[in-house]
Amino acid sequence: MRYFSRLTTTTLLLAAFFEPRLSEAQRTINSTLTLPTELPTGNYDLEVFGNFSTVLAIANPPDERNTLYFAERSGRIIVYSDLENQIREQDPFLVIPSTVTTNGENGLLGLAFHPQYRLNGYFFVFYTSQRESGERTNRVSRFRRSQSDPFLADPDSETILFDQVDQANNHNGGDIHFGPDGYLYISLGDEGAGNDAYQNSQVTNGDFFAGLARIDVDRLPANIEPTEQPDAPRDSEGKAYYSVPVDNPLVSRWQEGGGDPESDLRLEFYAIGLRNPWRMSFDPATGDLWTGDVGQGAREEIDIITKGGNYGWAFREGFIGGPRSQTPPLGFETVVEPIHDYPRSQGTSITGGVVYRGSRLPELEGAYIFGDYGSNRIWALFPDPNGVSPNIEQITSVSNPVAFARDPSNGDILICSLSGTIRRLVRGSGKEPVFPETLTQTGAFKSLITLEPENGIIA
């Protein structure tokens, strides 16, 4: 903490200038020293917000500051209809009617509300399912709010956008958010196992893995139909249930090549080179998209995602080399370094967080709050405006953090644990000692010119 840095510096200065002497005389009592006599009790506390069954995503409809929805791993979505009075609806907003697999890293992983939710009632989920054949899939679906009750969804309204076979039960990504541009962003892992076992990284003409997709769920006229993909269902007119933004990185290359609708080029990709992007979020003030990407055995990393960015997996892991030798594919030649990475001595599985934009902890304004599932540490990352290394401070710890969110009513940080408990980050209850800002204010010296100490400083 910054407090300890100041205290240590002053203590070392005093020790460097003065050498203690033993004396048989009675020690003089000092009455001028203003250094605090107690250590700080901690800047932050954690208040229990509520208990659930492993929440992996929290979301609220746009412009609704007093409601919040909690996506449980099992496939249930719970709603707090009145945050101010802590009113939790007795019935779940939705229980996904299809089979939701929950082994490994599977489950209901993502939840996002359409920007026009108040008008159309649409919301979207990412969950893992299983076909009758036994194949496990990653599924993105759209549901609709019930017409009879604003705090219930229609379970029969599911429309599947894509339902992709996945051979492993880890590295699913699965977070979804609408960006400031109105498009849906989807995080995608490399399918699982180690060393990019299924060889999905740096591949843009295969399946939806190892990157981040951006799609248009409104199918605006300016955007284009995706290329044919067996795992993306079509409507009665042969159209996909989404379109591809015309400015996605691969679209111009595809169009220049003739625009073959049967091409295997996956135009949905917005960024690639991610191993297991576990939790991402937009900064509401800047629009930056922050992502925590889980490493393999050496580094955990934080990235700010940009259009066309290549984040290096599997030839990079954080700032160091990765397990494979690869050439970036066309359209994603720009390799983007992480904002920050850290070694296994600090943690083993990053959980991406959120940028703090609340009002009750002003010293955290603009800081990215994130954690590590393995070490239980919660950090604040303060970006450097000049682009040099950010400042990182551990601010608390939480057992097995799996997701972060903001309370829309006040901007507070909410932290989800694997156990199901959700905690709120608040100001510490202990009184913070007041530390003098200058040597004069310490009361340790009679004169700063001669550095003669006050009576009682040296026995």
Where are these regions (language model features)?
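Acidic/polar, solvent-exposed loop segments in beta-strand-rich repeat domains
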Residues: 193-207
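C-terminal segment of classical bacterial N-terminal signal peptides
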Residues: 16-22
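Hydrophobic alpha-helical targeting segments used for export or membrane insertion
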Residues: 8-16
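Acidic, Gly/Ser/Thr-rich repeat motifs that build Ca2+-stabilized beta-propeller blades
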Residues: 26-195, 279-282, 287-298, 346-386, ...
